[in-house]
Each structure stands twice: as C-alpha cells, then as structure tokens.
Amino acid sequence: MSAVPLTRMLPLRFLTHLLLLSFIPLYFCMEFSEDARNIEKIRRGNQWAIGHFMGKKSLQDTYNPSEQDMDSEDFRPRIIEMIRGTFRQEPIRALSPRKQDEIQWMLKKIMDDYIKTTQK
C-alpha cells in the first residue's frame, strides 16, 4: 500500500487553491467590463438635472404671484415682510437658560421613549 505523504500533498493543494482563486477575480473583472460597454446603448431620457446644469430648468419656471394673489390676505406685502424679518431674526436670538432646559428635557423624554419602543 503506497500512501502519499502529507508533506507532498500540501504544496499541490496550495497550488490548486492559488490557481482557482486567481481566476475568480478575473471572472468578475471581465463581467463588469462587459457591462460597461453596454451602458452607452441605454437610453437616458431627459438629463436636465445632471452635473453643473442641475436646477437650471426648474429656476426658469418659478412662481410669479399675480395681482389677485397680491390682494389676498396671505400675500399682503406687510405680512410677507414680517415673516421675512422673523426668519432673519430667529437664528440670532439666543434662548434663555430656562427654555434651553425645557428643550433638553423634551429631547431626553423623546429619546427615552424611542429607546423603550425599540427595545420591545
């Protein structure tokens, strides 16, 4: 009975694995390179929001209020200016320490409730 020693089988096994594993990445590289050639044939449709042209078309169609809108209750110029002033001043105004504590307490309560519901 002739048995092949283990020391002689290990190099052959290593060589076999090396050859097999070297072809697997080659197969995937070839598969992806073939798909890249077919991308040119895909119809892409309207590409107005691509790259540096992004948003150009949508800015041309902005809303212009009509006279009827300006006369309505919602579009009075004074109300619009008050709203703009509020938005400009809001980030500048600092919160009082009491208000900060209230907000922190609410956020803590929300987070606690969230953690309790996710653990169930």
From Swiss-Prot:
Keyword entries, A-Z: Amidation, Cleavage on pair of basic residues, Secreted, Signal
Tissue expression remark: Brain, intestine, and ovaries and early embryos (stages 2 and 10).
GO cellular component: extracellular region
Tagged with keyword Secreted: yes
Gene name for this UniProt entry: nmb
Lineage per the UniProt record: Eukaryota, Metazoa, Chordata, Craniata, Vertebrata
InterPro entries: Bombesin
One BP term from GO: neuropeptide signaling pathway
Family: Belongs to the bombesin/neuromedin-B/ranatensin family.
Protein name stated in the entry: Neuromedin-B
Signal peptide region: 1-29
Propiece span(s): 30-44, 58-120
Cell location: Secreted
